[in-house]
């Protein structure tokens, strides 16, 4: 049986077979330019990620899932606005092109983090045997969205986890220590493409992390995501028994999913705080990549 000790996350260029297939579907279904660290970490455990993805994907194709992520995103912005702007940008000497690139990078993570949070809440509900409401009996059709990465989305490029630059390496070490994380998340590694900017926002964010209002806001985001996940259209056929049958330790899978469910509200909140320096809250509360409304007769969310 595959234990769940820390393993090397599977990079996008390392993926083959079923993992390559799932990575492609993640990019297309979540409408994102790359695969984030939490999903790449799960890919290290053989059949786990394909089974998890296939169980979740019917819901992830739906407008209901997109709307749920939009609601989490708007709540994160409201919480960030109450905490207050970081005011970290002034005096950095960034050029116009750098300003635009940073804003685009923030849009990428501001879009995907709420989706990952709802996805993780849904996975835990199914895995824990929690009831996920089904609307099959209440609606003749489930509204789906078009797949595909938005053409204006920033590529998910990032600095290596072990950077050569000693200042960036020290910054990553501080982020890991402060957040008690075994690795630096994709968000920070992308922002490290502009190390002066990351250093500035991290120095402003770090003292906020210890504030009670920050913890309450993060807990509230997690509660919202779980409540919204309960009302997604399709049940999640991924039980502890099925995971065990795959040869993966179910208890440690649950521990990792719980870890992600604690982490992702804070990532969503942090990116909202970063982005408030660039964009007013009213605009930031709207999806940076809204989707067209389309309606299909759906069977399990598949097309």
Which residues fall in each region the model found?
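Hydrophobic alpha-helical segments
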Residues: 1-303
């Amino acid at each position: 049986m595959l234990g769940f000790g820390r393993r090397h996350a599977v990079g996008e260029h390392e993926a083959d077979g079923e993992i390559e297939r799932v990575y492609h579907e993640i990019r297309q279904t979540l409408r994102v330019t790359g695969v984030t660290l939490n999903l790449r970490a799960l890919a290290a455990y053989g059949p786990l990620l394909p089974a998890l993805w296939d169980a979740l994907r019917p819901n992830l194709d739906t407008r209901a899932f997109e709307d749920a992520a939009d609601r989490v995103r708007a709540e994160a912005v409201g919480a960030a606005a109450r905490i207050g702007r970081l005011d970290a940008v002034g005096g950095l000497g960034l050029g116009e092109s750098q300003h635009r690139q940073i804003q685009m990078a923030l849009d990428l993570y501001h879009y995907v983090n709420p989706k990952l949070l709802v996805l993780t809440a849904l996975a835990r509900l199914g895995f824990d045997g929690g009831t996920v409401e089904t609307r099959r009996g209440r609606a003749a059709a489930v509204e789906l969205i078009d797949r595909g990465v938005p053409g204006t989305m920033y590529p998910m490029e990032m600095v290596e986890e072990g950077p050569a630059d000693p200042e960036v390496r020290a910054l990553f070490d501080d982020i890991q220590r402060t957040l008690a994380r075994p690795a630096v998340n994709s968000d920070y590694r992308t922002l490290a493409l502009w190390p002066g900017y990351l250093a500035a926002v991290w120095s402003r964010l770090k003292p906020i992390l210890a504030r009670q209002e920050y913890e309450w806001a993060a807990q509230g985001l997690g509660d919202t995501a779980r409540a919204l996940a309960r009302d997604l259209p399709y049940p999640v056929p991924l039980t502890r028994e099925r995971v065990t049958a795959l040869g993966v330790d179910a208890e440690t899978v649950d521990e990792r999913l719980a870890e992600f469910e604690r982490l992702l509200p804070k990532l969503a909140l942090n990116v909202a705080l970063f982005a408030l320096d660039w964009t007013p809250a009213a605009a930031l509360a709207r999806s940076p990549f809204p989707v067209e409304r389309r309606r299909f007769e759906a069977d399990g969310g598949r097309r």
